[in-house]
Amino acid sequence: MPRPDWAPLPRPGCVNVDGKVLLVREGLALAMLRFEPEATIDEHSAPYEVDVICLEGEGFISVEDRVNSFAAGQWMTWPADRVHRLWTADHGMITMMVERL
């Protein structure tokens, strides 16, 4: 079975973030993101809910004006059509993204 490879996120505003898509099915996509220290995904929104699970490391997560620390074992749901962001400071982080398309 082929294994997906890590690749830089092609989205403008993403700095030092690699991703790999694990699964895409009707209504569902699973991906992992790997953040280096000082990495960021700029503020953006999506027309669907996204569950974000921190698997390893630590960083920060926001929804609109709410900013929270984000560390291994924590999760948050980004509501549809709300501005959100993920980033790191001194440490790296790996997240699982569960997109309900």
PLM features: residue spans?
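A short, N-terminal "cap"/entry segment at the start of jelly-roll beta-barrel domains
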Residues: M1-A31
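Short strand-coil-strand connectors
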Residues: E26, S62-R66, A89
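Ligand-binding loop in jelly-roll beta-barrel domains
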Residues: A80-L101
